[in-house]
Each structure stands twice: as structure tokens, then as C-alpha cells.
Amino acid sequence: MTSSDWANPYGVRKPYGSNGPANGFPDADARATFSADHPLVPWKQPDHMDQWVDVDHSGEQLKRFLARWPTLDELLDGGSGDGRVVIVSGLPGMGKTSLIHRCIHEARQRVAKGASEAGDPLAVCVPTAGLMNDGHRISVGPDGSFAPVELINTRIRKEIAKRLLRHAFPEERVRSIVAEEDPYQAYGDMRDLLDQHNALLFAVIPHIRWNDAGLRTDFLRSCLSAAHPRIVLFVEVSHGAAETAREEVAATLHGSAAVTHLALRELDAEDIWRFSHSARAANGGPGGLVEPDRSSLVAAHSEWRPSDVRELRRVFHSAADALRSAPHPWPIDADALRPHWERRRAGRASLLRDPIPPRSGG
């Protein structure tokens, strides 16, 4: 870890290093590390809330999530017949994973508020592809090819099983759930186990680059069938310019009261300015930086046209790093950002001229 990484106010603290130690608890001897490209995970790293900003319509979608979130009684009610599926869709790099983690943070808080009246249910959170939500972890086979759907579903259950075992659920019951060939039966057995231990499951399912649109539709439907009472699945769906996941999700799961669809869209003119406030606080101020220049950053949108939230964070991180050596405090404005976005733009142009061959599989 370099001193610039340590000091950079736009770096995101990695929860317990990266995806956490094996036991799921912080290591008192571990040194904090920061990244220019890590999702915000406030349910695991509370100070990530300080870096949450409403970019790419995420605030609007968070309000939608909270408005549709069921009561704790409804989540626990085995007679309701339904669990819940929350689908977050949008272009790559737009902050879908951060929005999912923020939704889980809010859901855990709501569960905690009503916990005493419900016997203090345990909320078990399982990012099945790690906190970065990297679908390759579960969608690529041992030989590097795309894994069969059955293997993907089994891997998801194995990740859930690991977390249940850490919470001292009966090993024999957990192993039988993984071994069950019928996914619907497996999640039904999981529901029974959660009910017996007064627990809830919040599982995060990553975006998977399906080789066939029909497989993706079938997988989304299987997620809905897997969402039994006490089980909430948060499913990430990325899409490119050639397709609209919003329409696909609506057509696939139309009319189900158990589904909440959150759709992120393109950045607007205010998002550069909004993102400038995602700096970590330090010594009572935003990491030693001068208050960002609003008019300059709003005007920069038409010149820069950032492609996604990931690009915003990397450019701000790079600019803040460069400003550390300035002889006096310097505002994050268009002039400070321009050299860094121009470098990225040149890199994109180079890739368009000489594209990298696509990877096989997920």
C-alpha cells in the first residue's frame, strides 16, 4: 500500500482487506487498504455510508426499494408463499453492486428495528460471488469454458452453505441442501432450516454473461422460484447498448408481487458534481481538498461525457492523487480532472482501434 493510496480521499476502504477473512470478522492486526475501484459495502464497512452519493439515479431507485420492502412479519411469514427477488439492472460500471449492498444495509436496519418483537431473527448475508460481485467466480467451469446452469446453481448454494455453517447451522442439514438436485426443493429445505433457526437469508447473485438470452430468462425465473419465505435474492443484471435489461426483466417476471426491479440509467449533467462529494472525510474536511467547484464540474459534463460511475471514481482518485503534491490546496474542478479523463479517453480510443479479443465463458 502506497502513501498516496492511504491518503487518497476518493479511495474506498476494502472491508477487512478485500472480501473479508475466512471467519467473516475483522482482523485487528490487518492494515486498512484502499481501492479506486471497489463497491461501497455499508452493511459490512459502516464508514462506506460517508461516501454514498446519489449518482446515476441511485437515490431514486433506493427510495423505490424502501417503498416496496415488506414488513418483517411478511418476510418471516411462511404462509405467504413468497420470498423476495430484487433485480438491479443497468449498464456495466454504473454502481449496481454498490446499490445492492446499500439495499442490504437498509434491509438489515429495518429488520433490527422490529427484531425484539420477532424473537431477534438472524439476518445472514451471502455475497455468493464476493463483495465485488464477480460472476466469473461461479460461471466459469474448471476448463475455462462457460459452466452449465446446473453447476452455477450448485455453486450458489455452496456459497450460501459456507455462510450458514459459519453461523453454526447443522452441518448435515446444510450439506443435504447442497446435494439436493431439485433447486426448488433445495430452497424449500433451506426455508425450513431458516424457519427453525429464526433466520433470514439475503443472498447476492452476480451478473452472469449468459451465452444465450433464453438461458438468462430461465435463470431469472429460477431465482423467483428459489425465493421462498425468509429468502431474499438480490440479482444483478448488466446490459449493453444493444439490449435493454429493463424490458427483458419486465417481460420475464411480469406481474409478480415478489419482484422489485431497480433500473440504473445513464449519467446526467449533475452527476460529476454529486460524485465530487464522495470523498472520505479526514481531519474534519474532505481529505484536505478544497470544496469542489460546482459550476466547473457541471459544465465539464458536456466536455468529458464520463461513461460510468467506475470512470468517475478512477478519474477523481487519479486527480486527487496528483493534487497531493500541489504547493497549496487546490479544488477538484474541471482543470484538475481534465488530464486524467483525457488519458482514459485516449485509452478507450486505442482499444477501439485494436480491441482485445473477447474472453470465452462467463
Regions found by a protein language model. Give the residues of each.
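Residue-level preference for the first positions of well-ordered beta-strands
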Residues: 83-87, 199-202, 232
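Hydrophobic residues on the short alpha-helix immediately C-terminal to a glycine-rich phosphate/catalytic loop
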Residues: 103-107
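C-terminal alpha-helical "lid" subdomain
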Residues: 2-42, 47, 61, 265-362
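The catalytic "switch" region of P-loop NTPases
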Residues: 92, 135-140, 199, 211-304
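N-terminal pre-Walker A segment at the start of P-loop NTPase domains
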Residues: 39-74
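Walker A/P-loop nucleotide-binding motif
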Residues: 80-102
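Conserved catalytic segments around the Walker B and adjacent sensor/switch elements
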Residues: 110-143
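Mid-core helix/loop region of P-loop NTP-binding domains shared across ATPases and GTPases
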Residues: 151-228, 288-303, 312
